[in-house]
A protein has these predicted regions:
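Structural beta-alpha unit
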Residues: 24, 72-106
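General small-molecule cofactor/ligand-binding pocket signal
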Residues: 35-37, 82-86, 137
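Short secondary-structure boundary segments
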Residues: 38-40, 110-111, 140
Length: 140
């Protein structure tokens, strides 16, 4: 049923729960592909070249660490696992990947690392739910 699963993560606790759920789904559904995507907002250009490069390097290192942890949580699945690190607004990046990779399902946490912790549904999750062309599973 869900051969192409897209997991959007950001390193939050909710994303960790979504990662476990996506791994379980991929195993149970015998999915062909689980694609794990992490996207971060662009580094502001006003930082200047040396500071900008340092900020980009720090974000890339953090993203790689988050992806490594996600791969451990997912564990062994019957299909392939692909990872992508993207720069740009997270919801837009997830929607773009879902469309271009023809995802059957998007899995993501209900809230991320944003400052509005009291919200029931995070702004990025809400945007994905509103604009996705495939089913979206939001995990708490």
């Amino acid at each position: 049923m869900f051969n192409q699963i897209l997991l959007g993560i950001d390193g939050s606790e909710h994303a960790l729960h979504a990662t476990k759920t996506a791994g379980d789904l991929a195993r149970n559904m015998k999915s062909q592909t689980l694609r794990i995507v992490i996207a971060f907002d662009p580094v502001p250009p006003y930082l200047g070249e040396p500071n900008m490069q340092a900020a980009i390097s720090a974000r890339m290192k953090e993203a790689e660490t988050i992806l490594e942890n996600a791969l451990k949580v997912v564990g062994e699945i019957p299909g392939e696992v692909h990872t992508e690190i993207l720069e740009g607004p997270p919801a837009e990046a997830i929607l773009d990947v879902a469309k271009t990779r023809k995802s059957d399902l998007i899995v993501m946490g209900s809230r991320g690392l944003g400052r509005l912790r009291g919200m029931l549904l995070g702004s990025q999750s809400q945007k994905v739910v509103q604009h996705a062309s495939c089913p979206v599973l939001i995990v708490r």
